[in-house]
């Protein structure tokens, strides 16, 4: 998987257990996903076809599965596909995490990852009153992103309370 670490803007956070890495998504990918999401929301037929809410835990009115072809699209000629950009971010995360380990982990980190398997992806269009309760995501890595923020959240008094995400860590008890 190709990777240009110099073009990926990332910050590491380690508040507890697993390392969190915050990435800055380039604007062309944001624009591509927003255009895609807006087209789905504008079409009742497409919105129903891609409705993913039965597979998710939240109380959210618009949750749409991202079709596989979107991951392979490029926002322009100069950028890799969304999947390849995300793969480069994942590679950076894995290398950074492994380099915190022992000598054997460092050797593995230098090789990088060879394959990424994407299990599920969806867009959530949150509106006033929507919420997601605490829940688990299964798999090795999870990602979340914000593509649009209402002006009231970006500038007004709501800024300090709205649009938050909370990460919890632990193993599910099976009893």
Feature map (PLM): residue ranges:
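Non-heme Fe(II)/2-oxoglutarate
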Residues: 2-110, 129-132
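A general secondary-structure signal for short beta-strands and their flanking turns/coil
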Residues: 16-18, 116, 138-140
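Short acidic alpha-helical/loop segments enriched in Asp/Glu that coordinate divalent cations
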Residues: 97-117, 137, 153-159
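Catalytic core of non-heme Fe(II) oxygenases with the double-stranded beta-helix
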Residues: 119-175
């Amino acid at each position: 998987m190709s990777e240009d670490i110099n073009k990926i803007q990332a910050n590491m956070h380690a508040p507890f257990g697993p390392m969190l890495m915050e990435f800055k998504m380039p604007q062309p990918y944001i624009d591509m996903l927003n255009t895609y999401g807006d087209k789905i929301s504008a079409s009742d037929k497409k919105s129903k076809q891609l409705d993913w809410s039965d597979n998710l835990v939240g109380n959210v009115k618009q949750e749409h599965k991202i079709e596989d072809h979107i991951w392979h699209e490029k926002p322009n000629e100069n950028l890799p596909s969304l999947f390849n950009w995300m793969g480069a971010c994942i590679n950076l995360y894995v290398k950074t995490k492994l380099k915190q380990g022992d000598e054997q982990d460092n050797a593995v980190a230098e090789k990088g990852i060879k394959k990424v398997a994407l299990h599920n992806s969806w867009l959530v269009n949150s509106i006033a009153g929507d919420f997601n309760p605490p829940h688990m995501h299964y798999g090795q890595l999870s990602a979340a992103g914000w593509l649009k923020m209402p002006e009231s959240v970006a500038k007004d008094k709501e800024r300090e309370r709205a649009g938050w995400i909370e990460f919890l860590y632990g193993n599910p008890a099976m009893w």
